[in-house]
């Protein structure tokens, strides 16, 4: 194990230990190691400083650094846990953890609630849902008439806004998602597909596993 720790210490210098991150998330050590390779690739795409800025994040998601997108901005802001305008490796892994198949339903519901609550008011309001819906439709290259979008919004708030105060609180959102689990399809990160399939099934061979065998 000494050889691994010596090499790992050099490889991950300045970043959180993969074994520690694996113990705090649903990822295995091998998966964290693969995520580190991914992190290095993204964080050096514009400025090689060991951190992911918004431009690099945008480039990784949409292969374009010029395209402004509400969805990408919201995901970046939620990954930027320390609110420094950049994402370090620890935050990258912990943020991706919510998209892991073994992540709890409660965590996924909480993430999607915060994703839609763009103004951080503790409520999801109609305009926020509309903005996100339009952004997602744009990314999937789908077009809906304004009337259709308004019908979707009407139906959403009719079903989710139980107390009819014009906004959806955390409990209402949780109940709504539990009745409509398809809403969590966003948690498969379809718009991060190019990132998450860079290393299919995390095929990198872990040095920890190698030592263990």
Swiss-Prot record:
Outcome reported for the amino acid change (mutating residue 201 to A): Loss of phosphorylation
Subcellular location: Cell membrane
Site (Involved in dimerization): 140
List of residues binding Ca(2+) 1: 117, 119, 121, 123, 128
A single MF term (Gene Ontology): calcium ion binding
Binding site for Ca(2+) 2: 161, 163, 165, 167, 172
Effects seen without this gene: No visible phenotypes when grown under normal conditions, but increased sensitivity to low temperature. Hypersensitivity to paclobutrazol and to drought, glucose and salt stresses.
InterPro entries to which the protein is assigned, alphabetical: CNBL1-10, EF-hand-dom_pair, EF_Hand_1_Ca_BS, EF_hand_dom
Phenotype for residue 201 to D: Increased interaction with CIPK23
Induction data: By light, drought, salt, cold and wounding. Up-regulated by glucose, but not by sucrose or fructose.
Primary subcellular site in the record, as a coarse category: membrane
S-stearoyl cysteine: lipidated positions: 3
PROSITE patterns linked: EF_HAND_1 (PS00018), EF_HAND_2 (PS50222)
Pfam families: EF-hand_7
Domain writeup: The N-terminal 12 amino acids are sufficient for cell membrane targeting.
Family: Belongs to the calcineurin regulatory subunit family.
Function, as annotated: Acts as a calcium sensor involved in the signaling pathway during growth and development and in response to abiotic stresses. May function as a positive regulator of salt and drought responses and as a negative regulator of cold response. Contributes to the regulation of early stress-related CBF/DREB transcription factors. CBL proteins interact with CIPK serine-threonine protein kinases. Binding of a CBL protein to the regulatory NAF domain of a CIPK protein lead to the activation of the kinase in a calcium-dependent manner.
Name of the molecule in the record: Calcineurin B-like protein 1
Organism expressing this protein natively: Arabidopsis thaliana
Lineage of the organism: Eukaryota, Viridiplantae, Streptophyta, Embryophyta, Tracheophyta
